[in-house]
Amino acid sequence: GIELSTARYFTQATLAFMLVGYVVGIIAIPKYMTQATALKICSWLGIVFTIGAVLTSGFVSVAFIALLGLANSLMWPAIFPLAIDGLGKFTKIGSALLIMAIAGGAILPLVYGWLSELTSSQQAYWLMVPCYLFILFFAVKGHKIGKTA
């Protein structure tokens, strides 16, 4: 395994990567890229880093997990405005439903735990790939469904 003296810094690295993502988002959105573009980039990063975490081992695998902080940094700040855009008088209801949807995120850790017991904690990360693929779909096409140009 990885020495505790090294492993203890991975949480800090994850938070640092997330902070970098926040700062990039503050600087780049909307001046240099749209929220949809940021979400596309972060979705791809999530897919790549997750696959990297599963297919590598040791320090490199854990580093990919830490890099997920960067991939996840702009997810919610991009999903929320894209989802409520154009809702008009239903914006309050749409916002409330999005906030309640956070509870759905509480289900995946349970599924991950179950998969970890069946396979391994590393292989259970495959669960995240379809999630990131769905977010990518939302960034590319899903947020446009039902909206007029």
Regions found by a protein language model. Give the residues of each.
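Helix-to-loop junctions at the C-terminal end of transmembrane segments
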Residues: G21-T34, S116
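Short hydrophobic/small-residue motifs within alpha-helical transmembrane segments
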Residues: T14-V20, I102-G104
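Intracellular juxtamembrane helix-capping segments at the cytosolic ends
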Residues: S73-G88
